[in-house]
């Protein structure tokens, strides 16, 4: 394992108090030529922000809450010949989001800027100290040359996990690693992949998501090629320990899970409207899974569906929408989402709630019964979005086409929102005209 130290360490002034005014904290000016996910992590009295600066350089800021000042680092990278850039510099790909996590001992782990690229991974030498960030050239050292969709999360014991896809759209498999703080080494959680495309497809998964009763649930769809229209076969599995998986009817699944072995929620075929940008999972009062997703109806219109299993593994499916438009998508590259569906959420009154937004019909929320999935009237007083105050106080630019983006972080110290602006997705292709940098601001939600 080769370790390389970070460069460009700077101490920056930052508000000492956790009480932030309506204008927020100006963090930096950032790249706005296309959207890509930044990351905000607030945990154990510390806060970390990972983003791409105005020059598209990977940048990390760390601070201790309640103290003045922060530390800003720009870790070094290595050449990525096929991209004609370095691994710490962003190209034009909207897949190249950033992921962070703290392990039990407070060491920060950072990964991202990959779309079928060699693993990009950094780790600090000291707990909570971003100035000690180092590049680590491998995790397990196996199948790490075509990495996409990095994701850190914790299992029920608090072990740090890392999920990623090896390969590409139409030809990829999902792998899971587990971290040992004592040895500072990663190993495979299971032998081989969890979701296996068998060399002719790949899975796009939502999850694993932990339900209130402690189980992990995963929903995915298969895709045959890089063409987004070839998504099909919405599927489901759950596990207590992320190692042994089963269907909703408690039938054990042999690993890896393939298209032949996974439990099917909706057998939608290619071209029938399944899209990996619009599906999620939530839970009712008894921790039963409820899945939200987009597909076309019999007339070819876009609709929002919800589904839930019974004890025998039969899925009840119901449409919540009655739209008369069609979100027609196809081709490769990052596309702009015209339908967004949240995770089904259990309300205090016992109903399920689902937020949605569309380009053609606006947005809103539905309320529905958790057992029958039948629509219910909204309550007399609906909850307000916690970010509404932030939305009113972000002074956006006048540059044509700019969109507001945000990411939030909630911990014992409160809720924070990181907000910036960017142009929309461009199929991962360069633009002829580069817009000016955008403000990156941090807000405390009271």
What residues fall within each predicted segment?
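Bacterial N-terminal signal peptides
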Residues: 4-13
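Sec/Tat signal peptide C-region and signal peptidase I cleavage site
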Residues: 14-18
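Extracellular, repeat-based ectodomains that mediate carbohydrate processing or recognition
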Residues: 19-446
């Amino acid at each position: 394992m080769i370790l390389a130290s970070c460069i460009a360490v700077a101490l920056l002034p930052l508000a000492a108090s956790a009480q932030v005014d309506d204008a927020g904290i100006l963090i930096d000016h950032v790249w706005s030529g296309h959207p890509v996910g930044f990351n905000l992590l607030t945990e154990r009295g510390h806060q970390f922000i990972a983003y791409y600066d105005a020059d598209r350089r990977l940048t990390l800021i760390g601070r201790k809450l309640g103290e003045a000042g922060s530390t800003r680092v720009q870790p070094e990278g290595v050449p990525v010949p096929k991209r004609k850039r370095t691994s710490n510099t962003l190209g034009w790909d909207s897949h190249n989001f950033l992921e962070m996590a703290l392990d039990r001992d407070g060491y920060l782990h950072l990964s991202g800027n990959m779309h079928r690229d060699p693993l990009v991974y950094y780790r600090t030498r000291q707990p909570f100290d971003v100035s000690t960030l180092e590049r680590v050239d491998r995790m397990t050292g196996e199948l790490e040359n075509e990495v996409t969709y990095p994701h850190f999360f914790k299992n029920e014991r608090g072990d740090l996990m890392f999920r990623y896809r090896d390969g590409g759209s139409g030809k990829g498999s999902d792998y899971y690693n587990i971290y040992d703080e004592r040895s500072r080494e990663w190993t495979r959680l299971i032998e081989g992949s969890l979701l296996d495309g068998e060399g002719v497809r790949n899975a796009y998964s939502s999850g694993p998501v932990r339900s209130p009763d402690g189980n992990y649930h995963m929903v995915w769809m298969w895709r045959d090629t890089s063409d987004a229209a070839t998504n099909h076969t919405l599927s489901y599995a759950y596990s207590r320990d992320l190692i042994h998986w089963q269907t909703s009817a408690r039938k054990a699944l042999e690993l890896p899970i393939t298209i032949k072995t996974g439990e099917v929620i909706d057998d939608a075929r290619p071209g029938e409207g399944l899209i990996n940008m619009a599906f999620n999972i939530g839970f009712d009062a008894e921790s039963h899974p409820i899945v939200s997703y987009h597909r076309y109806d019999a007339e070819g219109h876009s609709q929002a569906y919800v589904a839930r299993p019974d004890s025998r593994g039969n899925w009840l499916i119901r449409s919540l929408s009655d739209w008369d438009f069609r979100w027609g998508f196809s081709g490769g590259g990052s596309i702009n989402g015209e339908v967004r569906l949240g995770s089904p959420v259990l309300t205090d009154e016992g109903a399920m709630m689902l937020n949605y937004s569309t380009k053609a019909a606006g947005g809103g929320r539905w309320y529905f019964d958790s057992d029958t999935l039948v629509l219910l009237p909204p309550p007399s007083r609906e909850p307000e979005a916690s970010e509404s105050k932030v939305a009113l106080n972000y002074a956006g630019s006048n540059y044509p086409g700019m969109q507001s983006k945000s990411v939030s972080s909630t911990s014992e110290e409160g809720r924070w929102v990181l907000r910036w602006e960017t142009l929309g997705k461009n199929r991962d292709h360069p633009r002829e005209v580069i817009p000016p940098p955008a403000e990156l601001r941090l807000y405390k939600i009271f």
